[in-house]
């Protein structure tokens, strides 16, 4: 079930400059693969770092959390609606192994390892050109308000 940016916007409440998933290319029963195209025009490159632009690691982790949230909706056979969100609840075992720079395509992968009472834990990897840039265990929480 590939998703273009319009479909992704249905699943995530994030908008520019914090929407960090450009496309979903693969969805399995418990896993998802997508990507973020990293452009020199990203706002964060103005300050991180002007003479040596590197994508901030925390934004790579956020991109992994966003793709994990999309998978949470899909695994629940739920389409997003007002009052239903997957929120970034935590990150464990985060490791940064390779710099991500302008022009890179960051491949984002998440695989479910645990689900309990609305809490989901995913093993996540971000790669560039087949080389691991970041690994993390991402935790998201399914929030349902009265509107849902």
Curated annotation (Swiss-Prot):
Task: Tell me if Lipid metabolism is a UniProt keyword of this record.
Answer: yes
Sorted alphabetically, the keyword list is: Cytoplasm, Lipid A biosynthesis, Lipid biosynthesis, Lipid metabolism, Lyase
Documented EC number(s)? 4.2.1.59
Gene Ontology terms describing biological process: fatty acid biosynthetic process; lipid A biosynthetic process
What's the main place this protein lives? Answer: cytoplasm
Does the entry feature the keyword Transmembrane, yes or no? no
According to its UniProt entry, what is the function of this protein? Involved in unsaturated fatty acids biosynthesis. Catalyzes the dehydration of short chain beta-hydroxyacyl-ACPs and long chain saturated and unsaturated beta-hydroxyacyl-ACPs.
Name of the protein this chain belongs to: 3-hydroxyacyl-[acyl-carrier-protein] dehydratase FabZ
The record lists the organism as Acinetobacter baylyi (strain ATCC 33305 / BD413 / ADP1)
